[in-house]
């Protein structure tokens, strides 16, 4: 199913050149409670699949419920042929709106700037982005002061994601006024 997309990415990357593109691979690094460890094999296999389609990721973003220690990062780096600092941890987040802050904390911005811009161009990115408004948005989202019950009538209401766009729009509409 994904083959046409992978081929399009491969062709685009060849046309743009390595200094004008960056490929990030998002992968799950599951924690197996029975073994008490994070498993990197699924990540290694998915990168090998990408390689079979002619794509070598520049960064690997590792979703996980547990932190990646230095040994896990080293292992992923070694077996997936990426720099160790390009192995980015993405811990499970309470809300998707936390993801930009988690990525910032992992240094992905600096990694992207280093990869795509010359040293002279990098000066434009020397200042830290002001994320105060985003942090305020998150605070309001996670700590509503008022709750308003809303009934949703539909055919598939028992399926949690059936009306996801509607429920998400209600949530977002309430954020400025700290309403849930």
Positions of predicted regions on the chain:
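N-terminal beta1-alpha1 cap of cysteine-dependent amidohydrolase-like domains
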Residues: 1-180
């Amino acid at each position: 199913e994904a083959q046409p997309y992978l081929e399009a990415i491969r062709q685009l990357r060849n046309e743009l050149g390595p200094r004008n593109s960056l490929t990030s691979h998002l992968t799950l690094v599951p924690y197996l409670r029975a073994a008490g460890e994070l498993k990197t094999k699924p990540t290694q296999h998915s990168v090998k699949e990408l390689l079979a389609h002619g794509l070598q990721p520049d960064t690997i973003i590792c979703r996980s419920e547990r932190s990646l220690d230095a040994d896990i990062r080293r292992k992923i780096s070694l077996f997936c042929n990426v720099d160790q600092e390009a192995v980015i941890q993405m811990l499970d987040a309470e809300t998707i709106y936390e993801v930009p802050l988690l990525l910032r904390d992992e240094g992905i911005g600096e990694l992207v700037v280093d990869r795509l811009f010359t040293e002279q161009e990098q000066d434009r990115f020397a200042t830290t982005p002001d994320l105060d408004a985003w942090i305020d948005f998150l605070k309001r989202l996670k700590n509503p002061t008022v709750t308003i019950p809303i009934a949703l009538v539909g055919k598939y209401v028992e399926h949690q994601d059936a009306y996801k766009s509607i429920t998400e729009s209600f949530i977002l509409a309430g954020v400025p006024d700290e309403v849930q």
